[in-house]
UniProtKB/Swiss-Prot annotation:
It comes from Methanocaldococcus jannaschii (strain ATCC 43067 / DSM 2661 / JAL-1 / JCM 10045 / NBRC 100440). Keywords: Signal. Residues 1-30 form the signal peptide. It comes from the Archaea. This is Uncharacterized protein MJ1291.
Length: 240
């Protein structure tokens, strides 16, 4: 074999060796890039799936409108004259999974300078006002029912269908509630219940507006907590 033939063989071997080295380096680099990319993408996919499938959801009317509540034109809702009202908030809780869930709810007011309370009402007993321990509330020796049709310095009550009632005594007579001022014994902003798997249930909150300016936009937030986290729902009172 002459020298030119030998040189050609050596050149070919060098080219093959170089190609092998470059290929191995590229394989190592691409494998590392793929591995790093997979590690970064996987948590995002899991997070996205977790956000799409919510264990529970809340359905409700989100905005309520109120007019002609300011009886004396002082641009406020107060107890004197009696202009206060209670609005029924019906919440439907939906369980999207098979598992039974313990649900703890709480309501907050996000609007400053509003005096309010979340009260208990027994709607199976003519909308009887209850204290925070769910006993009939004793107001000056009388129980308060929100089934009246006559205003006599009587607090208003709107049921879940928007129908208006007034505070009344057990005999049905209109009841003056302008001195019903102790909201501490009435306020109960929490509610807990068991929500069966793949089911729905309705829970009522009763929001008493005790003192606020008029007009005003009052925003409430319901937070429902389970072992899987929190679900929030905002509700707005538009008072004009």
């Amino acid at each position: 074999m002459n020298k030119s033939g030998m040189s050609l063989i050596i050149t070919m071997l060098l080219l093959i060796g170089t190609a092998i080295v470059i290929g191995a380096a590229y394989y190592a680099w691409s494998n590392k890039v793929f591995s790093d990319t997979t590690e970064k993408i996987t948590p995002t996919i899991k997070s996205s799936i977790g956000n799409i499938i919510k264990p529970i959801e809340i359905s409700t009317i989100e905005t309520y409108y109120f007019t002609n509540l300011d009886l004396n034109g002082d641009s406020r809702i107060t107890n004197n004259p009696e202009e206060r009202f209670i609005q029924t908030i019906k919440l439907e809780f939906i369980n999207n999974i098979d598992e039974d869930l313990n649900v703890n709810t709480r309501i907050y007011c996000l609007t400053p300078n509003v005096s309010w309370a979340s009260v208990n009402i027994d709607d199976s007993s003519n909308n009887l006002l209850l204290d925070r321990d769910e006993n009939p509330y004793n107001y000056s020796g009388q129980y308060v029912y929100f089934n009246g049709t006559v205003y006599y310095s009587s607090m208003k009550f709107y049921d879940e269908n928007g129908k208006l009632f007034y505070a009344a005594a057990s005999n049905g007579n209109a009841l003056n509630t302008s001195n019903l001022l102790d909201l501490i014994d009435l306020n109960c902003p929490t509610e807990s219940f068991l929500l069966k798997g793949n089911s729905k249930t309705d829970i009522n909150y009763y929001i008493l507006i005790n003192n606020t300016k008029v007009p005003n936009t009052i925003i409430f937030e319901i937070i429902a907590s389970t072992k899987y986290g929190d679900v929030e729902k905002k509700i707005t009172f538009e008072i004009s």
